[in-house]
Amino acid sequence: MGKTLYHKLYNSHIVYEQNNVTSILYIDLHLIHEVTXPQAFNSLRLKNRKIRQPKKTFATMDHNVPTHNRDIKNSEYMAKIQMEELSKNCKDFNIKLYDINHPHQGIVHVLGPEKGMTLPGMVIVCGDSHTSTHGAFGALAFGIGTSEVEHVLATQTLQQNRLKTMNIEITGNINPMVFAKDIILSIIRKLSTSGGIGYVIEFSGSVISQLSMESRMTICNMSIEMGAKSGLIAPDIITYNYLKNKSYSPKNKYWNNAINYWNTLKSDKNAFFDKKISINISNLAPQITWGTKPDQVISIDEPIPNIDSLKMFLNKNQLKNPLLYMGLKPGEYLNNLVVDKVFIGSCTNSRTEDLRAAANIVQNTHVAKNVHAIVVPGSGMVKLQAEEEGLDKIFINAGFEWRLPGCSMCLGMNLDRLKPKERCASTSNRNFEGRQGRDGRTHLVSPAMAAAAAIFGHFVDIRKI
């Protein structure tokens, strides 16, 4: 029997195995940020332990950083403390830090790939659930808790059980104004937020092979929203072209050796998957969430389902809270729903490709009077590239705020937040209650959909503008 990509990655990193179920895996890359790292470092100090492989650990500030300016003195108390602690810890333990004033600082899941830290064949961990993003490169990447962060720092290993495997084959034609965000939202709707629990999901098919690395990262980024441990896409020529000449990518003869190895990182034709799903997206329309879970999704031209038709809920009462929270009703269409704020950013959709898609919508237009719209590049490198292309001017001239890199309004841990009852068109990954601010209402959409909502002042079907 052949092996899946997941099993090839897992097996090649086993340091110690017990009963063919639980293994200790070697960790190739450990990414850290200011929120989940402080307690781990404090514990190392208490136990008088050193970091096993400091050069395989990289840090950045992203969750708490202010995006208006770089003065952390204006940040809230806990955010300020966490950033100061990360700076001190990285200095004390000799860890490379892309701090708040570094020109390449950015969201950890944007920074890692664009610097070439993320490479095919690796096992990658970070104290952040959206570490699954890096699986787009054919790496086994997953989020870990703070106690596990400490363990990896101390040993460069981590105990992991073997997981089940799922293959989602995506076929068909990608329609105009349909993006990777729409594809993954539609898949989450189909599988639900629990459909991937206990699995590593490998995405494949003719659609995946056409996607850029930025789009593949969007797909893998949100695999966690199905409950999956990680998402995977086998590396190919698109992967290699993206990685070539990156700061940490192999160089010269090592590059050729790497390509030879990376070419083996694909599931064998006779590999067994515990579950296989095939999805044709030829009829897919732009997607939008209507509730408070990422699987509460509809097409922009589709009404919110009636209670009786929602099989994902065990009883009708379970639907009342999200609709009440969002101020919506069953049967309602969202294509004229007024928005208060628009957020284009996050580790899901803050790369140059995402900003181009949004800029293409807003060029020679202006943000509606009722809307406050911000664009937050995912990193300093993304910001620089966008400015070289003139994207910043397109956004600024259209009435958007052009911000500094950071996680920003994806989560209410910094100064960018929704006020109670404010409705936001957001390119982020989670629409939980209070995620973007207390009592804020979040609708997940693609960058193009968010940009259009900013211009019209309400959601629209971007295929018709």
From Swiss-Prot:
Cofactors required: [4Fe-4S] cluster
Single GO biological process annotation from the record: L-leucine biosynthetic process
Endoplasmic reticulum recorded as keyword: no
Molecular function terms, GO-annotated: 3-isopropylmalate dehydratase activity; 4 iron, 4 sulfur cluster binding; metal ion binding
Catalytic activity, EC: 4.2.1.33
Family according to the record: Belongs to the aconitase/IPM isomerase family. LeuC type 1 subfamily.
Assembly, per entry: Heterodimer of LeuC and LeuD.
Name this protein carries in UniProt: 3-isopropylmalate dehydratase large subunit
Species of provenance: Buchnera aphidicola subsp. Pemphigus spyrothecae
Name of the gene this protein is made from: leuC
